[in-house]
Amino acid sequence: MVTIQPDASEYGGQTVTGAAWPNIDESVLASAASDLEAVANHLRDNVVPSAGRQKMKLADSWEGKGADSALDEANAIIGEHEQNEVEAREAAAKLRRMEFAVAVAKTLANQTAEQVQNDCQRIMDEGQPSEGEDTRFERVATRIREGYDDNVRMVAEVSHQLAADLGIVPPEPWGHPGSPARTPQTPDQHPDGQLGTVDSGSSAPAPPPSLFAPPPPSRNADRPSQLGTEVAAKAEPTPSLETVQSGSPVPPDPLVGGEAPARSNPPFAQPHSDAPSTSGASTPPAVGPAPAPTTGSGTMRPQAPAQALPPGHLDSLSPATSNEISSNAVSPSAFGAKSGTPLEQFQKGLADAAKTGGSPQTLSTAPSQPLGAPPTTQPLGAAPPTAGPAAPPTTGGPPAPVAQAAGGPGGGAGPAPVAPPLSGGVPGGAVPLGPPPTPPPAAPVTTPPLASGAPVAPTGAAAGAAGGGGAQVAPIPVSAARAERDLAQRAVRRSGVDPMETARRIAAALNAPGMTNVEDFKFFWVTGLTADGKIVVANNYGIAYIPQQVHLPEQVYMASADESISPAERASWVNEPIVAVQRWAEHNGRVLRAVIATEDQLKNSDAGVHHEVLRPEDIPENGKMAGRDRLQVIAPDVSSQLAKIGDADLVSVLPPAPADSNPPEDRRKSLWDNVWKPLASRSAKRGERHLTAFVAYAAHAQEHALYAAHTAALPDEQRQAIREFIYWQHVGQLTADALAPA
């Protein structure tokens, strides 16, 4: 592979130096990737088969305990070889992504350089005016500076996207609050008439470089620095262009000070409006997520808590009816009380929520966050953020052993021991659904009610504040082929992440291997994208059903978990996820832009909008996403409050253990078969039968979760079992309410 060299033209060549050029040899990356691919192929084609043959010979000629031990060791060695192959391929794939990113950045930088060269040449060809001031040199200097700034932004954008694709935290972009800004320089006139600038005597340390750029060269305060060629100066000198007295071009330092020319399509959001500046110097904008909406007072819009578990204990609940699930808002103080122990706060919050009912889900009007953005959540009752985003609520520990104890598709755990009547709901009361957590606001933005359906653009300050810090969230999984296409498309657009790219990656991750249970016959997801960037998902199973291994990112809404829509209406979508995202958009005053799914999933359907088809090469090998588990999606407040309860108090939120200490009969397999069987039917009542079977399964799943919670050996196991108990109680009650006669 031939290394792409920077443009060497007189004017354009000055826009591909320093931070405006990825100073990495892509051929070295390609060579390293080829070596790792060769290692992986050798392990696959030679080492592992040879070891397997030796193991078989050993098994044929040796028996006894010694032979068994030897076979175990052989299996372990083969397993290590196979793991080495996997790791070699993963490393090679990352190197290929890096190689591609470097090539894209260099190609685009040279295209900008070529355009700058042509523009500057046309300016100089105008000739000296017969009268008036000769502004050619100043215009050339400005055009070079514009091209250089464009390339700096482009290289930073490519490097940050590459970092997100590789799952690493990208470096802070130049101009990020806290990064040093260089002291602006004072223009001066050289003795020979050349235009240049000299340092004012001191400069701050150089800002951190991008992922591609090498460290900037050191500077001497008494030596002129350069960006430009020999340009005879008859016009006013500009502080943004430097030349050497000898006329020979020198690679420039990264430019931070000075006003950057306005551009029509900057790829970055503006930096924080309150970022400190040095001597009036401006800094290149920083990358960051869009701000979340706030009320006019500057505080976060109160997030309505989900209708929760009733007073004190789960066993003291009275059956709830669909009439009790109203749209009355619950005061945030219900879960934000500061008095009492966490257990008392949890019980009080559940009691208050049970009395007033859940409130409808509220959508923000800010665009969805781009890939790699650090969304966070703020617990109810906390003070509005003033100096940074709040930490997301913690979950109840790893779900490992409970998946077997709680069982069922997705590791589901279960309800109270009595199958619930369709009209009355799950015994022990309901834990109805709640909205997903609302990200904390970045700056005061006035947001109208959702019903108006009119999106409001964030103010400049709010948009700038979006580039702030926060916990880095793991990127959405993406296949190598899709990552390359996205990078190329974004580079061509010369802009940030399109919401379609984010939505498509989420849709692909939901369709990845391991995100669907083997027992879930014909289960699939559909992802919708609205015109204002909202992402909504729906599947063809039940109401608010999510497989246990699936986590949804913070910015994703689930159509059937929206409590502002009646259970009966949500039941009418069951088994039809495309209809679900359409109705969700209509209900929330949104315009659907596209639906995203595989070709088979979109076959014989017409959503009335663009169909974005997922190809096999778009699907990543692993679809695990950072985000909310299924209880956090449908009942975020209950999940957050449960996380605050100490391990010793966990048993206090459970109903009493059954008198029979033996585990309940495991009928989850047969009951789940009844859930999916209606999907194979063409009967007009298949949706009703599907939901009826879901209620029965949810009741049995609660029973197993309750047993697992009372018999768990470790606090983490007990906590996870309780989460499963609450989840299946929510789903069972919601489904029963949906089936109840109007």
Swiss-Prot record:
Spans annotated as Disordered: 167-471
Residue ranges, compositional bias (Polar residues): 318-331, 358-368
Low complexity composition-biased segments: 421-432, 448-464
Compositionally biased spans, kind Pro residues: 205-218, 386-401, 433-447
Disruption phenotype: Loss of DNA conjugation when disrupted in recipient strain; strain still secretes EsxB.
Function of the molecule: May be involved in the ESX-1 / type VII specialized secretion system (T7SS), which exports several proteins including EsxA and EsxB. Involved in DNA conjugation in the recipient strain.
Note: In the well characterized mc(2)155 strain this gene is interrupted and its 5' end is replaced; the last third of the protein is nearly identical in both strains (from residue 468 on in this entry).
Full protein name: Uncharacterized protein D806_0078
Source species: Mycolicibacterium smegmatis (strain MKD8) (Mycobacterium smegmatis)
